[in-house]
């Protein structure tokens, strides 16, 4: 068996051979007029004769040469179609080119349809043209008795070489087609709800809107430090101040943090804000949006995610932040009065809280390890501690807590929402508290944003805000178990 380097050299030689025959192996243009799936389906219903020609373009998927005649398969973006080519139809030169084709070569074909004795709709090829040589051999995926062999399955290679992954693994292509549908449906849904889609800065002088470490860059002309945005929140709320009552943005955020099955430093977020609304407005919107997406993508509200059947039917369960922690850990953090006591109880559960410097940060670690993985069915976690929510409005009926919720499904958070804090004095105090935490070593604490305070001083109406992680939502709706499976080109270490 030839190794890959020898195969590559053979294929390069075939390119040279074509050039020596005066044939351009990379022609300027070829315009298909049909897709394989469409013409097969139409032919099954209404057969056509040799007078009806079709032009197809795609990759050579398989080939079986039998002297003066050959069978092959072409794969395009819609599916696979069988090909039948003969020396008599193509002529000596073209048939020789057809026989020399390698799997993965991109070719253009013209021909008419017929059915073989086995009943398979087949393109009888009347002309063939090499459009681009597949110099590097593709992995050959074979299936026998329902078992897949030789798949391009190395996860790291798949992520690094997504272009090969998409060619070889149809389910990967399907995931990203579904992702595109989800994004389109979100835009349609929000537009129909009266939202205006806007764009806010990707480079910001102050990294705000979330507790996260930013990526830092520098603008040479202005000689100023800038941050890739960690969230668009503070700019979107400036628009609410300006009288734009319903706005949303669906775009990228960047956070200089770890990489895991749930985190990628570059990710897609949808944030929406409604003036004269509150947390409950956004809770209703979240429930309606996600059930709408499930119906559009799956045609049902019960969807399979791994071994779990998830029922998205409304209404979703609601439970407070402290109660859900107590349910899964036995600790009632609302009764704990010292950091030492909080750390002791967390340590008894083998939760590492060595870097936590407040009671509620200890609680959040316990929540992440003990409660979150168990939140399989959809649930809204409500009534978060004020300390963990610097931009949310205080709950007037529950001192020390805010009007905030996070939706959880399949063991992970998929969003964050609250009644927005619109009191500039309260907001400034919370920013100042965050600055103190930052100076104490918390590099994820918020920075002071004086301009945002100034915007609030002009008056912002009671407002509801919502953020939904698109990548995690796609994970849920495509039964994907790593965020990298929903991002075309996830960040990777250098090879």
Curated annotation (Swiss-Prot):
It is an enzyme of class 6 (ligase). The keyword Magnesium applies. It is found in: Cytoplasm. Signal peptide: none annotated. One of its GO terms (cellular component) is cytosol. Mg(2+) 1 binds at residues 406, 413. Its cofactor is Mg(2+). GO terms for biological process: lysyl-tRNA aminoacylation. InterPro entries: Aa-tRNA-synt_II, aa-tRNA-synth_II, aa-tRNA-synth_II/BPL/LPL, Lys-tRNA-ligase_II, Lys-tRNA-ligase_II_N, Lys-tRNA-synth_II_C, NA-bd_OB-fold, NA-bd_OB_tRNA. Binds 3 Mg(2+) ions per subunit. Its EC number is 6.1.1.6. It holds the Pfam family tRNA-synt_2. Homodimer. Belongs to the class-II aminoacyl-tRNA synthetase family. This is Lysine--tRNA ligase. It comes from Leptospira borgpetersenii serovar Hardjo-bovis (strain JB197). The gene is lysS.
